[in-house]
């Protein structure tokens, strides 16, 4: 991503380091990628995998102890064919935008002629004056069917904010995501499926706790804090 003046609003497509691209952001920024003290990383909510058709909220973090302005560009490709787009992106806020290959236009739906999609920073997303790190969040929806492994390519720019290409630091990284089978729907047991949470017997009164027995339930938990118990009454929401 280019944070010289002309590209503060986001770079042209094709600078993530993916195969067949123009290179990385070092094409316009002096220096060698990954030579500074910082880094770029992508945070995946469920680990480095994907469920076909299931949208994930991804988070890109660019960090460098010395820098004060930030940018990124990211794309998703099929591992078996790096020229094939893998899913689609949707910005979560004004800090990122979607562009298509061979187009400087801000457009979320790419044509058949330019099917490769990128997500990158906007001018607002550069957050000039913010020190040490910046994060960008957006949604990625993988293909609706299993296409095998998917590779995420990302380049981050940790800039010094002088509006020139000197002193900026470029960081790159890639991640390979494996397909994950869609989880089965929860199933409540036929016998003793829903019972009173205190007595473990049938008969549910309004406002009471219940115990639900079955299979394929999620592993998430919820712990109530002391300040949530008011006048001896426990919370009734998760």
Language-model regions, residue ranges each:
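Sequence context surrounding c-type heme c attachment/ligation sites in exported
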Residues: 2-141, 145-182
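Beta-strand/beta-sandwich contexts
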Residues: 182-236
């Amino acid at each position: 991503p280019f944070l010289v003046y002309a590209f503060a609003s986001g770079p042209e497509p094709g600078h993530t380091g993916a195969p067949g691209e123009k290179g990385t952001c070092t094409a316009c920024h002096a220096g060698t990628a990954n030579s500074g003290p910082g880094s770029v990383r992508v945070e995946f909510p469920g680990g480095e995998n994907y469920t076909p058709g299931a949208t994930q909220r991804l988070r890109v973090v660019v960090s460098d102890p010395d820098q004060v302005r930030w940018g990124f560009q990211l794309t998703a490709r099929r591992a078996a064919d790096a020229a094939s787009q893998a899913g689609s992106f949707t910005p979560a806020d004004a800090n990122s935008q979607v562009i298509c290959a061979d187009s400087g236009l801000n457009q979320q739906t790419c044509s058949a002629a330019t099917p490769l999609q990128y997500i990158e920073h906007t001018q607002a997303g550069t957050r000039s004056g913010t020190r040490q790190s910046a994060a960008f969040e957006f949604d990625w929806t993988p293909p609706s069917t299993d296409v095998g492994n998917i590779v995420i390519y990302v380049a981050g720019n940790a800039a010094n904010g002088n509006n020139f290409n000197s002193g900026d630091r470029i960081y790159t990284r890639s991640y390979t995501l494996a397909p994950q089978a869609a989880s089965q729907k929860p199933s409540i047991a036929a016998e003793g499926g829903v019972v009173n949470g205190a007595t473990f017997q049938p008969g549910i009164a309004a406002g009471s706790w219940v115990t639900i027995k079955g299979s394929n339930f999620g592993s998430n938990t919820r712990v109530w804090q002391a300040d949530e118990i008011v006048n001896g009454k426990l919370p009734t929401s998760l």
